[in-house]
Amino acid sequence: MTQMYNSARSCPSRANLLTGLYPHQTGLGHMDGSHPAWPKGYSGFRSNSDNVTIAEVLKDAGYFTAMSGKWHLGNKSNPILRGFQEYYGLLGGFNSFWNPAVYTRLPKDRTPRHYEEGTFYATNVITDYAIDFIDQAHQEKKPLFLYLAYNAPHFPL
């Protein structure tokens, strides 16, 4: 990228990054969530096709597209519906770094990795899946687009 303008934080910035559009154009003009004190506005990444993601464009161009990490673009869509062929991560907002039950593997027919009790740490696991996706693209002999979105920068541990 030679130019990217970030006019919002968090969810709207993710929508901006994935589409190249301003957050209000993506349907996500404010932080996604259900907090009653938050102003009403644009809630949720539009799942219709008028805002194409970079993953959709690159998938159509023959890339292997994968995402590992935090989605948090509303519940109207998910990474698979928006051009990613493989996904592992947190679909919603902040949650535990140590509880594998709150993380999702998509498409749904994929078997998630198993971690012994006490060994799961989200940043490491998100990285493990990213490496798996790199290996998968290599095996399929396809160029790779990997969107890696760690949750760790959001809160102190």
Roles of regions detected by a PLM:
Residues 1-157:
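Formylglycine-dependent sulfatase
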